[in-house]
Curated annotation (Swiss-Prot):
Belongs to the plant acyltransferase family. This is Putrescine hydroxycinnamoyltransferase 2. The active site is at H160, D301. The lineage of its organism: Eukaryota, Viridiplantae, Streptophyta, Embryophyta, Tracheophyta. InterPro entries: CAT-like_dom_sf (IPR023213), Plant_Fungal_Acyltransferase (IPR050317). It comes from Oryza sativa subsp. japonica. It holds the Pfam family Transferase. One of its GO terms (molecular function) is hydroxycinnamoyltransferase activity. Keywords: Acyltransferase, Transferase. Its EC number is 2.3.1.-. It is an enzyme of class 2 (transferase). Hydroxycinnamoyl transferase that catalyzes the transfer of an acyl from p-coumaryol-CoA to putrescine, to produce coumaroyl putrescine.
Amino acid sequence: MATVEVLTSEVVAPAEETPAGAVWLSNLDLAARRGYTPTVYFYRRNGDDEAAFFAADAVRDGLARALVPFYPLAGRLGLAGGGEDGRVQIDCTGEGAVFVTARSGHYALDDLMNEFVPCDEMRDLFVPPTPPPNPPCALLLVQVTHLRCGGVVLGMALHHSVVDARSAAHFAETWASIVRGAPAGDAPVPPCFDHKLLAARPARAVLYDHPEYKPEPAPAPAHAATASTYASAIITLTKQQVGALKAACAGASTFRAVVALVWQCACRARSLPPDKANLFLLYKYISEDWVDIQLNIQQRDNCIYAPTLKANCCFTPTF
């Protein structure tokens, strides 16, 4: 795969003085994968003035202004008390985010978006290289890459201990709004970084069975169906396929119908014996909407739970 040419690399600090101190991280933040989440956004040029489209100065200035309401992203991952055994937190140092500009004379937007599949090569091209995700690392790194067609790829790497995908999208929306001309104080929805809203209760009380937090069961004997190397894939279901699937599931919701199909396929692919093997289904539940509505805020942290369903591998072949 071809490379891109890096033009500039700098650290962009908030445009104004921001609050100092530390932001406490909840158990949900600490349970998240400690690492950077890469995201790429594709933009087509919306006019004839190529120089003005995604002009580096305007994007850099917008980033500095967006970091004012999102000031924790300009900080560094830290440890409470400064010792090696301290609880992980955000140190609001105001140091800034890494900002990289680049260009590619090889790629056009259509080259990248035709049958787009996330891959390591795509990340290496359009997302800045990240440091080890441990204190005192930066929390936000961005790269703006101009393509030969005039389009732009915006790549971001955000530390997952600090924000999740919804929070990252909120930041990108705010940044874009500012670049289009909105004042920094007019963020679409002001963020809330009080992670203590999700603090655990003082006395632990486990009211339900949570297999996702229990030790993993002993692995089944390896065979051809389970010993192979894992692979990632994006499987697209058309509207017609989903409709037929839901009809076969007696009017079940899209989520339930697709999950049922995945469950059956997993059982078959692993050649699990019916009624003698448990299959665990883990899915993500985002509670930010509930928190936002209940407290009338826009919570910005990891409001993600991973409930797990467990059942015997038993099915009637219907698909």
